[in-house]
């Protein structure tokens, strides 16, 4: 079920403050975050976030198409190496 419209999008307050500070100062350094659950807002466009995937920080550059999605959607947590090839099928 989707989040109710009257509540608005969820963004961790500390992340919102860091993003606003980076926009005001014009800093190009990536913002390090563990908050995969935060929604990407229009004011995040152009910023780079280092999102933790459980093992390392994955750089995520925010573009217009990402607005409304969660930060965690762009930092995969699982690695799929592919299915093994069959020995008889070459």
Curated annotation (Swiss-Prot):
One of its GO terms (cellular component) is small ribosomal subunit. Pfam families: Ribosomal_S19 (PF00203). InterPro entries: Ribosomal_uS19, Ribosomal_uS19_bac-type, Ribosomal_uS19_CS, Ribosomal_uS19_SF. GO terms for molecular function: rRNA binding; structural constituent of ribosome. The gene is rpsS. One of its GO terms (biological process) is ribosomal small subunit assembly. This is Small ribosomal subunit protein uS19. Protein S19 forms a complex with S13 that binds strongly to the 16S ribosomal RNA. Keywords: Ribonucleoprotein, Ribosomal protein, RNA-binding, rRNA-binding. HAMAP family: Ribosomal_uS19. Belongs to the universal ribosomal protein uS19 family.
């Amino acid at each position: 079920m989707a989040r109710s419209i009257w509540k608005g999008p969820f963004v961790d307050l500390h992340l919102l403050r860091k993003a606003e500070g980076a926009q005001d100062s014009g800093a190009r350094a990536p913002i390090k975050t563990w908050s995969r659950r935060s929604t990407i807002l229009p004011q995040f466009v152009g910023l780079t976030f280092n999102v933790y995937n459980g093992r390392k920080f994955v750089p995520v550059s925010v573009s217009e198409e990402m607005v409304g999605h969660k930060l965690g959607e762009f930092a995969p947590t699982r690695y799929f190496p592919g299915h093994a090839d069959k020995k008889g099928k070459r």
